[in-house]
Regions:
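Beta-hairpin "wing" of winged helix-turn-helix
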Residues: 29-34, 61-71, 76-78
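Short, cationic-aromatic polyanion-contact patches
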Residues: 14, 72-88
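N-terminal helix-turn-helix
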Residues: 36-67
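Extreme N-terminal segment that seeds HTH/winged-HTH DNA-binding domains in transcriptional regulators
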Residues: 1-35, 41, 86-118
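Short loop/turn and capping residues at structural boundaries
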Residues: 35-36, 54, 71, 80, ...
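Intrinsically disordered, low-complexity segments enriched in polar/charged small residues
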Residues: 23, 45, 60, 75-76, ...
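Short Asp/Glu-rich motifs
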Residues: 43-44, 79-80, 118
Length: 118
């Protein structure tokens, strides 16, 4: 799995890892049942501490994106259609409000939605 981490950003590295895995799932690059790298392997590939990857995986588990089994490893979970969780709804509303306040037009936002849901 190829992650692009930017150590110059204010965004914590564990969160960059988490966000890129979520985007990979949304884009279909990571599919249900797919085995993810071990914490050690991903940490080595990214050049980060194992605790950083462990924190990202822990958050992904809490959010229901992945499952870890000591023998089977860490796999992407199947996601069924369901109601939008309130924290995601709030973040989405804030992001859309910020885009509108910044002068972004409706078509640009709709193009982004189509890109994610393609």
């Amino acid at each position: 799995m190829l992650l692009r981490l930017d150590f110059s950003l204010d965004t914590p590295i564990y969160l960059q890892i988490r966000n890129q895995i979520v985007r990979g799932i949304a884009a279909g690059e990571l599919v249900p049942g797919q085995l993810l790298p071990t914490v050690r392997a991903l940490a080595e590939d990214c050049g980060v501490n194992m605790m950083t990857v462990s924190k990202a995986y822990s958050q992904l588990k809490q959010e229901g994106y992945i499952r870890t089994d000591r023998r089977a490893g860490t796999v992407v979970l199947e996601r069924e259609d369901r109601e939008l969780p309130e924290p995601i709804r709030e973040n989405l509303l804030l992001a859309l409000s910020e885009a509108k306040a910044a002068g972004t037009n409706r078509e640009t936002v709709l193009d982004l939605v189509k890109e994610v849901f393609a």
